[in-house]
Structure formats: structure tokens, C-alpha cells
């Protein structure tokens, strides 16, 4: 609700900026009055949709261990509990980090490949998807922590962690989206900040509740490094074969 209103405020405060940067979109939409809704729709329809595909995918790999985590916690078997939690953390890190960082590195190219007939939406959404991809590291952490809290009977903790994060996101949106130069991209930044806050709180809460040091930072190092390598290599490879990929895609995608 707040994002379109803040965008409209930014549009009214500096119409010249938007007229210069989004002139083609304004013409296609029949006037600047529809620009805010167009930008918000592009963000939610493209950037957010692509971003949320990955947690749906990664959740499948760690979900099988959750009943075993609950059983080990109920029986008080600390060693088995630590081992199963470590399995979930590693699987989510190994799969999630490369996917998110690769999505960030290839944000515009992925959107252009999948939505080749919607170039105006892509132009609005590409930067937001780049930012969201970087923040996927925090989403991977926070979603893992929330799943663990739920299976050990601490369903109150996700709520306690999410409420401050959502409050920060709301405040950040209200005061920054209305700045014309950054506009809709702030929605992605505020989302990353929210997940970072939830991940940080979840990190300390998990160790405080369980009394176990899971060495999470150390376990993140290798998957995170692998994700960075994947992102860099994808950019390099695309530089060589990008035109060929686009040509082939044009034959099959509308």
C-alpha cells in the first residue's frame, strides 16, 4: 500500500526527473499518473516473483531433516540435534548462495531472456532484482532459522524476529522511496535490510535457545565463496556466448 503512494509523492515532487528517465514508459502508459502503479507492478511481477522462486526450491532439500530435528530436540539428544541442524544449514547454503548470487549477477539477462517481450518492465525491475539477489544470502539464513524454531516448539521466535524487521522495512520505505533518484529500488533495499535483521536476530536466538555453537559463519564461508565464483564465471561466460543464447531464445520465446 505504501510503495505506490510513496512513488506518487516522488513523482509529484520531481516530475522532470521521471519524465527524463521514464519518458517511453510514460508515453506507453498514457501519462505519468500511471507510472507509479506500473513500477510497482513491474517490481512485484518480475523482480519479486523471480526472487521468491529460490526459497521454494531450497526448502525442499532441508525439509526432510526437520522431523528428525524435532525428534532429537524432544529426546534431548544434543549431538544428533546439532548434526541434523548442520545438515539443513549446509544444504540450504550450498544450494541457496550460488543461486541467489548468480541471479544477482545475471539479473537483467535473466529477465530479458524470460520476458523478452516486456522490455519496459525489465528496465524497471533489473536493478531491484540485482539488489534482491544479493540479499538472498540473508533470506537463506532467516528462513532456515525460522524453520528450526518452529520444529523445536519456539514458534513465538519467528514472530518476534519478523515484527521489528517489518517495522524497519516500513519506515525505510516511507522515508526513502519518495526520493526520486532511487524510487522503486528502495523497496528491494528495505527487503534486504529486513531479512538481514531477521537473520542476525535468528543467529543469536538459535544459539541462545539451544546452547549450541553451530559455527554458522564458518559454515557459510565455502558456499558463499562458491556463490561468488559462480556469479563471476556466469558473467564471464555470458560475455562470450550471450549473443548466441539470445538468438536461440528468440526462436522459442515470444
Residue ranges, per PLM feature:
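Hydrophobic residues within alpha-helical transmembrane segments
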Residues: 50, 94, 131-134, 160-168, ...
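Membrane-interface junctions at transmembrane-helix termini in multi-pass inner-membrane proteins
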Residues: 134-164, 175
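Helix-loop junctions and terminal segments of transmembrane helices
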Residues: 55-77, 82-85, 146
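Interfacial segments at transmembrane-helix termini and the short loops linking adjacent helices
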Residues: 37, 86, 103-136
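Alpha-helical transmembrane segments of polytopic membrane transporters and translocases
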Residues: 18-58, 90-94
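Short alpha-helical transmembrane segments in multi-pass integral membrane proteins
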Residues: 84, 89-105, 184-207, 223-224, ...
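Alpha-helical transmembrane segments
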Residues: 142-153, 202-219
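Membrane-interface helix-loop junctions in multi-pass transport and translocation proteins
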Residues: 156, 164-200, 214, 232-253
Amino acid at each position: 500500500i505504501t510503495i505506490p503512494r510513496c512513488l506518487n509523492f516522488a513523482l509529484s515532487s520531481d516530475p522532470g526527473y521521471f519524465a527524463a528517465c521514464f519518458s517511453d514508459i510514460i508515453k506507453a502508459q498514457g501519462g505519468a499518473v500511471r507510472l507509479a502503479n506500473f513500477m510497482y507492478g513491474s517490481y512485484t511481477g518480475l523482480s519479486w516473483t523471480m526472487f521468491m522462486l529460490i526459497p521454494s526450491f531450497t526448502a525442499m532439500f532441508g525439509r526432510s531433516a526437520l522431523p528428525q530435528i524435532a525428534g532429537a530436540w524432544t529426546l534431548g539428544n544434543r549431538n544428533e540435534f546439532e548434526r541434523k541442524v548442520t545438515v539443513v544449514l549446509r544444504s540450504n547454503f550450498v544450494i541457496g548462495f550460488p543461486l541467489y548470487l548468480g541471479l544477482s549477477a545475471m539479473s537483467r539477462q535473466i529477465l530479458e531472456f524470460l520476458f523478452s517481450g516486456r522490455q519496459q518492465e525489465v528496465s524497471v525491475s533489473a536493478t531491484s532484482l540485482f539488489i534482491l539477489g544479493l540479499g538472498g544470502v540473508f533470506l537463506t539464513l532467516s528462513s532456515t532459522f525460522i524453520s528450526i524454531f518452529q520444529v523445536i516448539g519456539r514458534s513465538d521466535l519467528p514472530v518476534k524476529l519478523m515484527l521489528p524487521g517489518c517495522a524497519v522495512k516500513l519506515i525505510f520505505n516511507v522515508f526513502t522511496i519518495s526520493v526520486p533518484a532511487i524510487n522503486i529500488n528502495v523497496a528491494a533495499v528495505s527487503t534486504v535490510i529486513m531479512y538481514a535483521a531477521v537473520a542476525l536476530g535468528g543467529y543469536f536466538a538459535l544459539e541462545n535457545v539451544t546452547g549450541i555453537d553451530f559455527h554458522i559463519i564458518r559454515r557459510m564461508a565455502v558456499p558463499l565463496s562458491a556463490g561468488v565464483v559462480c556469479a563471476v564465471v556466469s558473467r564471464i561466460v555470458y560475455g562470450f556466448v550471450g549473443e548466441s543464447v539470445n538468438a536461440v531464445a528468440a526462436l522459442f520465446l515470444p
